[in-house]
Amino acid sequence: MSHAHPENWPVLIIAGALDTELLRDVKTLAAAAGESDGNPPFSEQTLVTLRGADAGDHSVLSFVLYAPDEDSDPATAEDLAGVAVVVENGDESGVLELAVHPSYRNQGVAGRLLDALQGKRGLGGLSAWSHGNHEAAAELATRFGYGPVRELWKMRLMSSTSALPDAGLPDGVSLRAFVPGQDEQAWLTANSAAFSHHPEQGSMTRADLEARKAEDWFDPEGFLLAVNAEGELLGFHWTKVHPRQGPHPAIGEVYVVGVTPEAQGLGLGKALTVAGIKHLQDQGLHAVMLYVDADNEAAVALYQKLGFVRWDTDVMYGPLTKN
């Protein structure tokens, strides 16, 4: 490990997709950070974008800081000190996520990355996620004139919690599993309608869906579709299982639940939520988690009634003044 100061280390700036070796190194760093913190430093969408973007695509910028080490040439994952990734939204705004390897923390690595970002792109229009709301992230945000603008709660239901309530499906509605090669377009249409108010989820494309289907965690049996007697898709509950990571056991996730506008108000959302949770619990998982915006009082109340409790918080930081 190098004992030089990070302010003297070169920052690599890459536009677009990362090459195979660098993406591997970033995943290794992310796994080490996640094991140390109990939270993954990058969102799933960010990793999907890093794999799928075109080379040279400036809507995705990665700032990579390798610690120079005379005993390591070329650089390896063990020498990757930190990474910052900016994904532009196309409207002069973007989202920043940053990770520092546990072995290189408290040495100024994050500040070095942000200085490079500020020099290359500037911070204008950028918001930044802190997954787990770490104290160091809050201090760094303050240094750069940022403050909290959004809270995303992580809620958890332990399998030892009392039984889930009964939540029957509306008359004429049945559940079945997603069928790859058949249901993609119907799901994209239903998802867009269900989340017309939610730009992140509602704007999912076929490429986004295919990228998730290619992930190791994808299981069509855990992708539940609610259909009417004519086979029309009215709602869905897509579940996910996160594998064990170091000391952290595997855990299920209420990945996304959606109901089309014409089927809302029938109790279908609750029925889908309960059905998906039961599917996850039947796999022997110790707990099920989900993400929900802290200010979505109706959703928080529903999940609390099902036995979920607040477990952790992701905080989005935004500029307090125009950069």
UniProtKB/Swiss-Prot annotation:
EC numbers listed for it are 2.3.1.189
Q: Which UniProt keywords apply?
A: Acyltransferase, Repeat, Transferase
Reactions catalysed according to its record: 1D-myo-inositol 2-(L-cysteinylamino)-2-deoxy-alpha-D-glucopyranoside + acetyl-CoA = mycothiol + CoA + H(+)
Pfam families given for it?
Acetyltransf_1, Acetyltransf_7
Residue sites binding acetyl-CoA 1 per the record: L98, A99, V100
**Residues noted as binding acetyl-CoA 2 in the record, renumbered to the chain:** V257, G258, V259, Q264, G265, L266, G267, L268, G269, K270
Q: Which residues bind 1D-myo-inositol 2-(L-cysteinylamino)-2-deoxy-alpha-D-glucopyranoside?
A: E44, E200, K240, E253, Y291
Q: What class of enzyme is it?
A: transferase
**Gene Ontology MF terms:** mycothiol synthase activity; protein-N-terminal-alanine acetyltransferase activity
**Can you give the residue ranges of the N-acetyltransferase domain?**
21-176, 173-323
State the InterPro entries in the record.
Acyl_CoA_acyltransferase, GNAT_dom, MshD_Acetyltransferase, Mycothiol_AcTrfase
- Keyword Membrane found: no
The answer, when asked if Repeat is one of the entry's keywords, is yes
Top-level lineage group = Bacteria
Q: Which residues form a coiled coil?
A: none
Q: Which GO terms describe its biological process?
A: mycothiol biosynthetic process
Quaternary data? Monomer.
- Which family does the UniProt entry place this protein in? Belongs to the acetyltransferase family. MshD subfamily.
Q: What does this protein do?
A: Catalyzes the transfer of acetyl from acetyl-CoA to desacetylmycothiol (Cys-GlcN-Ins) to form mycothiol.
Q: What is this protein called?
A: Mycothiol acetyltransferase
Species assigned in the record: Paenarthrobacter aurescens (strain TC1)
- State the taxonomy lineage: Bacteria, Bacillati, Actinomycetota, Actinomycetes, Micrococcales
State which gene encodes it: mshD
